[in-house]
């Protein structure tokens, strides 16, 4: 059985891309009730539903999404581990509660990178908090805040959204 179904080559891209995450949006598990994919590109999501609450966290320049390919020739399997590392300065009682709720659940997470692309991590299985810290720092210049590691495992890499989160049916909920 042949599994090689490549459809495109790849040219060397321009050097106009930057690293980093601008925002992440947490969505309660199963709130994305009507996921639809682009008819011409089934790796791209057109819609996540109607008026889906997306809780925005601003994580400029201090967070990353890494997708590790877990492939085994012996088992005939391939999966994609999605690891989201977040750093959020400043402790607050409101954030304490939300961090606790994120840790108890397994939300879907939309990642907006610094290039304006949106990815849906934990699309089917959600993302689990697998570690993190609530830290006051030691010296005056140290971070006082939260770090979180969320991990998910999916059959495919985190899908792109075809456009913005609001165009895909998300309702942005911002904090104070």
Residue ranges and their predicted role:
Residues 1-22, 171-176:
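N-terminal alpha-helical "arm" segments
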Residues 75-76, 99-101, 111, 138-142:
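A general structural signal for short secondary-structure junctions and capping/turn motifs
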Residues 21-29, 84-89, 105-113:
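Short, hydrophobic/proline-enriched secondary-structure or compact coil segments at domain edges
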Residues 10-83, 127-140:
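Solvent-exposed edge beta-strands and adjacent loop segments
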Residues 2-10, 79-100:
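Charged, amphipathic alpha-helical segments
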Residues 72-93, 142-156:
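Oligomerization/assembly interface segments of phage tail-like spikes and tubes
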Residues 99-121:
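Short, acidic/charged, Gly/Pro-enriched secondary-structure junctions
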Residues 126-176:
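Mixed-charge, glycine-accented linear interaction segment located at domain edges/termini
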